Amino acid sequence: MVGEGQVVECFLFGHGTHGIHGNGGGEEKDFVFWPFSVCSVWPVGLPEKISSLQNPRVKQLVKLRDRRPRDEAGVFLVEGYREIRRALEKQVALQEVYFAPDWFLGENEPALLEAARTAGAQLFELSKETFAKVAYRERPDGLLAVAPQWKQALGDLTLPAAPLLLVVEAIEKPGNLGTILRSADAAGCDAVIVCDPVTDIFNPNVVRASTGVLFSVPLVVEESARVRAWLQERKIRAVATTPAAPTLYTAADLRGPLAIVMGSEQYGLSDFWLKNADATVRIPMAGQADSLNVAMATIITLFEAVRQRH
């Protein structure tokens, strides 16, 4: 029964199987939709509509593109259907979801919004022009969420007997860090540890490049010295990558408890890691370039470890 002051909102779905949502990167299976109208009760009415570029919420969303306002508020932005869906799947407590139907790319957005509302997020409908103002993507899909930041410590990690870890030091570019997280997820890494970061792990482009994997891979930010001591305590070998290493990455033993350590784009690993690693390895280079993109080098080394372990 609908109580006084409540509003019934109905969405009509026309699929009897998993819906498909295209988002520029291929099709993805998503929520189960049934061929009838699903009605839900909105306790305090329909989502607030915002069309003014001067609205305080719009101004705050624009500010959250920068690190200081994000850290002060303890939140960050999650843009995109796929990224928001993965956040919900991992039970991230989204605080707010902003949507603009004029930008929608598929048919499943209403179900995603309903899932977010059910999970406790506050919904706001934006005009097309207003959403273009707050979106940071060149081609937005009409969905933007505000999520709480979190901090996980080394002691919070639950690891198997022979974990595969990825340690990255002083990564500078958000796109590289996001790609590294995505690759670590694909390789089945048990955790990613970011040492002495230059870029913010909650940068919108980290979220974007990771395709939302930021929410599924255990992620710790810590100082290099503490990470090295923690690895030693747990008898996890640290294998550092450097072009000067005498051993090819394919010739090294990458089985057992292992942490692969990657350095920054410009300078590679610091002397601290090169001196304190249990072993160093290199990827052979045949051309004029003296190094690979750090994300590509990470992928190559990680999947060699995966190959050896299977």
Tell me what each language-model feature is.
Residues 1-46:
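Intrinsic disorder/low-complexity segments
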Residues 240-289, 293:
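Active-site/ligand-binding-proximal alpha/beta "capping" segment
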Residues 145, 183-187, 196-214, 271-310:
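Structured adenosyl-cofactor binding patch, chiefly the S-adenosyl-L-methionine
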Residues 32, 40-138:
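N-terminal positively charged helical leader segments and presequences
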Residues 80, 172-179, 292-297:
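Amphipathic alpha-helical repeat scaffolds
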Residues 50, 76, 169-170, 195-196, ...:
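Glycine- and other small-residue-rich loops at beta-strand/loop junctions that grip anionic moieties
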Residues 89, 104, 115-118, 124-129, ...:
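RNA substrate-binding interface of SAM-dependent RNA methyltransferases
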